[in-house]
Amino acid sequence: MNHRSIFETVVLKIQELLQSKNFLDAHRLENHFVRKRLLSMYQVIVFLIYTTKQKLDTNIGNIRVDLPTLGFPKAISKQAVSKARQGIKPSLFQALLDLSVDAFYNNISKKNYWQEKYSLFAIDGSRLCLPPSKSNFEEFGHRFSRMNPKREWSEALASIAYDICNDYIVHGLIWYSLSSERKMAKCHFSAMEKLNLLENAIFILDRGYYSEDLFRFFYDKGCFCLMRLTESLNIAKKCSKTSLNTTLAGNPKNGTVDIPIRVIRVDLGNGTTEYLATNIPEEEIPTGLFKELYFKRWPIEQKYDEIKNQHLIEEFNGRTSTSIQQEFYINLLMANLASLIKADADEVIETNAKPTNKYRYQANRAYIIGRLKKIFPPVVIRQLPVDAIIVIFDESSNVKSQIQPGRSCPRKKGGKGRERKHFYNRKTAV
């Protein structure tokens, strides 16, 4: 299947699941949505998919106009909507995300690879600023301002496994703010193992992930990994040349054995030196390619930028831990759907590109996200046919932005550090 066909498959399957009593019953709390109320579970789910970053009252008013066939009740308060959504398990939206992943990897006819062989997966975490509430404090942790202890908020640790070559989120987690990113990485790996995605896979992880335990984990699983090292580690200090082949000593008390480890020294050209640890042998990938390979992980940073600044994931509409998790998985689902549209549009743009063009072009992702957010909900409830959303594929190939190679933005250091960003009484007007 091509990207359009996969997109259509995902939409049709979502339509089917949201009409399935067995599916809905599996993802509702006990004693919720068992009586006939003003709001049905189906209406609440569609509302959560539809809702924008505006105030809740505005969204309630808009959904009656934009989705008249949904039959959203008029005499309903925002408190009733907020209470009703608590009866829906976040696992429902996680299941929809998993559906998009299964549909892609089981049906894609032409996957992208690095060096025409390797699947590249990046794993990385990022903190999300949450609205202050008792529920979030208990589930995700309690934070205070350094300057003013009375200013309090919560943070969650989000982590995703990302297919670099195919611009697709494979798995996502949102945990307590002080959770172990290494433990989350193992959970991502287990999920991908079930999807049979490990053949010729290389996992790329940033500084902070390396530990002997995690390195052994990948080695024991027979899977390639590449981890950035901190300069203070002994194995990094020992690497005075371009590469070093050494051994991680085993410990009989822990049941571990000696395993080989390869350390690569990379000079960035600006006076900075980085060290990489890998279990990939020299005959598989030569030393000279590791600088290129490591920098292939940069798209996961761009994916977090997309999720935070285009999907505005931190502008949560709900204040409870259940609401946070619901919206987290909805945003990852929308990011994957947008990626399907962009991949198709990019192919059209590349096919129609002229050799005389100064720059290469790509589809404008912000445009795709905005159009998708508007058209997806009425298609889900069958108010519009699936063809209505397929139109975005054709439109997106005409809304382009330049690809300018070599652009960079130095990271700002210092400053006040992380402060509260989520203000519940400050919502966008659009």
Predicted regions: what is each one?
Residues 1-60, 74-75, 85-88, 95-97, ...:
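Single, function-defining residue in the core of a domain
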Residues 62-66:
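Short alpha-helical "recognition helix" segments of helix-turn-helix
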Residues 69-70:
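Blade-loop segments of beta-propeller domains
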Residues 119-121:
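Conserved beta-strand elements of the Class I
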Residues 139-145:
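Short Pro/Gly-enriched beta-strand edge/turn motifs at strand-loop
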